[in-house]
């Protein structure tokens, strides 16, 4: 009897988890790749995990904050661009290290200069644009 209850508990948990996980659209997936594979993002994340753990943190991540499709992407709001942040993860906070913007109309990746309130065009793998522009 205990095994049956345990089985249904595990089954129920896995069903709940699969419904709770939202998969972003194809375009958002490629926008993530554009950011994560950019030389600037790689520069910022080199050795970052070790430094975070040394300071009591758990990890870092890139998060989609807003997108042109907030209903299909796990983003917090609508924007004409794909807006990301690179953040550190601690038990009590998530400090943001950098913000990135991918503009699908201009086909350009930017790093946001928060102090001067401007976007700075940065290098990225242009081959990913072909995949981004592919209709699915």
Show where each model-derived region lies:
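C-terminal partner/receptor-binding element of secreted or periplasmic proteins
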Residues: 111-136
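Short, non-transmembrane alpha-helical segments in secretory-pathway proteins
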Residues: 21-68
């Amino acid at each position: 009897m205990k095994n049956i209850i345990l089985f249904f508990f595990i089954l129920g948990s896995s069903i709940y988890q699969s419904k709770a996980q939202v998969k972003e659209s194809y375009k958002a997936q490629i926008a993530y790749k554009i950011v994560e594979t950019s030389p600037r993002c790689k520069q910022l994340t080199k050795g970052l995990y070790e430094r975070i753990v040394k300071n009591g943190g758990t990890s870092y991540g890139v998060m989609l904050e807003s997108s042109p499709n907030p209903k299909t992407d796990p983003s917090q709001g609508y924007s004409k661009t794909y807006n990301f942040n690179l953040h550190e993860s601690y038990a009590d906070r998530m400090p943001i290290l950098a913000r990135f913007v991918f503009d699908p109309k201009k086909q350009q990746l930017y790093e946001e200069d928060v102090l001067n309130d401007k976007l700075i065009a940065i290098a990225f793998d242009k081959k990913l644009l072909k995949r981004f522009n592919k209709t699915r």
